[in-house]
Amino acid sequence: MSLLHGVGDFFALDIGTNSIRMIQLSGNVEKGWVLEKFAYVPIDSKLTQDDSETGRRRLGEIILGARQQAGIRTKNIAVGMPARKTYTAIIEVPNAPKREIVNTVKYEADQYVPMSVDDAKVDFAVLGISPNDTKKAEILLSSVDNAYAESLLERIEALGLNVIAQEPEPISMVRALAPVGVQDARMIIDLGETSTDLVVMYQDSPRLVRSIPGGLASFVKVVESSLKVREDQARQFILKFGLAQDKLEGKVYNALSSTLENFALELTKSVRFFQNRYAGVQVGGIVLSGFSGIIPFIAEYIEMKTGVATIQGNPWQYVKVTPQQQQLLLPVASEFAVAIGLAERSND
């Protein structure tokens, strides 16, 4: 089982806060990807937090039902792990032959992960020579608490499935969203239900990985309280009208003003941190995904606040889909970044 490296024939599973996404692709990076099978099933947000036997059984039934609905036959599965359950960082070690670098990281891992290595599952990939210092090599290091990883493994394999990879969600989502071959750096943002994942890519590799507390649910709570409306109405207002100041008399925008200011400040801090670390390298664009990929006018707001060109990304950019598939996916397409990225692992 691997946290980071490539695998063979499989399907991908992303267990979100309020839905599960499942996808199987054919093809590869060089020739392109083709969507073969997929499923999207809404779930109660309380279910993913329910660790009781009943809760586990119910979630398992939903996963198996989604697999059957999608027509997926393989039992091999790659599973995403939420950023809050993992630790991912870019570290630097003295440059040396790859075998020596591997040994250095392996024997000194306890210096880099925020938990005892005896209690953690640690994996890493050598990114190459640091763009900032040719005497250093950069390493993508990822770790997860053993208890959580083993619990997830047991729950999935109890369904008769074979877990061949577990991967931090931020690493998965950039595989689907990052532009290829650009000369500058790009920040990829996935606004989820309860948190926001942020990755800065440079030279086709992650160089900064972090998670920002707060997601769509925090936006909804603010609008619900400010406008004195029901939760479902607040959610609808945000997703339908977004930050348009000519809709609902700009009440949604005004209600979210302080929350958005703090959100944009976190993005600006990340841009500055990256540009201070990599002297002379600019973050040339921000790509939005998840709910930030569909909230009207949020891209314009972020661009105004950060001074960085911002677009709403398309996680399907490298995947061929039929018109019928596209029609079925339309309402939820932006939520598939992690699942697609997981499914695009095979030729990594």
Predicted regions and their residues:
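Non-catalytic, solvent-exposed interaction/assembly segments
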Residues: 1-108, 150-152, 184
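Small-residue (GG/TT-enriched) beta-loop-alpha framework at ligand/catalytic clefts
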Residues: 11-19, 23-36, 79, 134-236
